[in-house]
């Protein structure tokens, strides 16, 4: 089911990038742009994980963030759940 949603979602992002984004002007603080990042994340990790990564990216795309080069990660486990935040079952 997720693959059935993936292609139309990427198509919607392409339409946004081509038709709506030029009207709004360049506002993204990152390279690649947030829409390109979303397309790459969805294509690489599937619909749900891709949307999660894209939402996290959009939350970072704001004036208090310096921006810069921020590609889609190669490995989602290190991006979404870093070792310092994983539950090991040992509590102090």
Swiss-Prot record:
Q: Where is this protein localized, as stated in its record?
A: Cell inner membrane
Question: What InterPro entries does UniProt report for this protein, alphabetically?
Answer: Membr_insert_effic_factor_YidD
Mind telling me which Pfam families this protein's record contains? YidD
Q: What is its main location?
A: membrane
For this record, the Gene Ontology CC terms, alphabetical, are: plasma membrane
* Keyword terms: Cell inner membrane, Cell membrane, Membrane
* Membrane topology term: Peripheral membrane protein
Residues of the region (Disordered) are: 69-92
The function of this protein is: Could be involved in insertion of integral membrane proteins into the membrane.
Give the matching NCBIfam families: membrane protein insertion efficiency factor YidD
Q: Family, per the entry?
A: Belongs to the UPF0161 family.
Protein's UniProt name: Putative membrane protein insertion efficiency factor
